[in-house]
Design a protein with these regions (language model features):
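N-terminal secretory signal peptides
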Residues: 33-81
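Bacterial N-terminal signal peptides
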Residues: 7-16
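Sec-dependent signal peptide cleavage junction
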Residues: 17-29
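Glycine-rich active-site loops that engage anionic ligands at enzyme catalytic sites
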Residues: 70-155
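Extracytoplasmic
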Residues: 31-35, 46-48, 57, 101, ...
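Sterically constrained small-residue positions within well-ordered secondary structures
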Residues: 11, 27-29, 106, 140
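Positively charged n-region of N-terminal signal peptides that target proteins for export
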Residues: 1-4
Length: 155
């Protein structure tokens, strides 16, 4: 009888654990019903990019900020794999150990936004993904020096 009760308890615990694991949400599952518009000025040319925003509290906070007014960010190259600039507000963080891909839009330390044109691994929050450009095109658009990015959202 004790053996049967032990088996039942084990099965219940395994079922509960599996159910709880299935309820975990990934910050990249689902997208918000709006697009992020990005205007890039690299000093020699201007480009318009569009990105999807992931459905997480960080992206929602960014969208709320941008619904008030567009935000202009001065961005600098870092490590020859990203452009990074300070946001005018701190956003909630949902950091996870990830490896970025070209086109990823990442929240760093809650107050910096980065556009990746190469890979990097660290604890980051994914905000979204730039659409419709290759890695080579993105690298050319972002250029080798500083850029100015104007962020806005559309519904």
């Amino acid at each position: 009888m004790k053996k049967l009760i032990s088996i039942l308890i084990t099965v219940l615990l395994l079922t509960a654990t599996a159910s709880a694991a299935g309820n975990k949400t990934d910050s990249t599952k689902g997208v918000l019903p709006m697009k992020l518009n990005i205007q890039i000025d690299n000093g020699t040319s201007k480009h318009e990019l569009t990105a999807s925003l992931y459905d997480n509290s960080s992206s929602k906070a960014l969208a709320e900020l941008l619904q008030k007014a567009p935000v202009t960010i001065d961005m600098h190259d870092y490590g020859n794999f990203e452009k990074v600039g300070f946001l005018p507000a701190t956003l909630p963080r949902n950091d996870k150990q990830i490896t970025t891909e070209p086109g990823d839009i990442i929240l760093y330390l809650g107050n910096q936004i980065t556009f990746y044109y190469n890979t990097n691994s660290w604890n980051f929050t994914r905000l979204g993904k730039i659409e419709g450009v290759t890695q080579a095109e993105l690298k050319k658009i972002l250029g080798e020096g500083d850029v100015t990015a104007v962020l806005s959202v559309e519904k």
